[in-house]
Amino acid sequence: MLFLALAFASCHRGERQTLRSALQMAYADPDSALAMLHTIDRRSLPPEEKAYYALTYYLAQDKSGLDVANDSLIRIAYNYYAKHPKDSLYARCMYYMGVYYSLSDSLERANYCLDVAAQEAQVQKDTATLCLVWSKNSWVVRKTNAPLGLKYASQALAVYRKYSQATPLNTIYYILLKGECERLCGKSQEALSGSKEAERIALALGDSVTLSNVYQDMSCFAAGAHDAKAVH
């Protein structure tokens, strides 16, 4: 019996380490993180690890650009973390619950979850999650309330610039998001000027896909600036 108990504990330690590695990997290489998660039988996990698994899987799917409109996974995470608001992953869970609701057109619920996520991220000094929340808020409201969208996008970019673990790719994303909001506010020239920084970063990265996305946005900003000049 002792041998079986030790073997069981050792198995769970191994799965726990795999989960921790998968969460870290999900940000930079989500496809590999998903492959790693597929090696774990989540049915045998204790509640805490099952919630961790569900959140990590949902996060990796989102980063991979896969459909995350199904709430079965994030709901498992939410049901656990809602009872453990002091957990370091509570803010991130509330963020992804907000993402789910925004995809389901439940904007009132989405706003509630995102507000809670922002508050908890500030308490926990979780800069990455805070910037994600503000960028999602910006994306949700930008077409109905462009000035508010610009406010959120500007906050996200300003805070992310100071983040010690900021990545060039995410910095580009926040610059372009701010630019899109500026365009919607009739400030296409400012958007075009700001996007030149994104172009420099993308050129330094040597990522053709990212550079193509930057040029596509710059073209849109340039067209808006040209139209504005034609009006005046």
Q: Where would I find each of the regions flagged by the language model?
A:
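A "functional boundary" signal
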Residues: 3-232
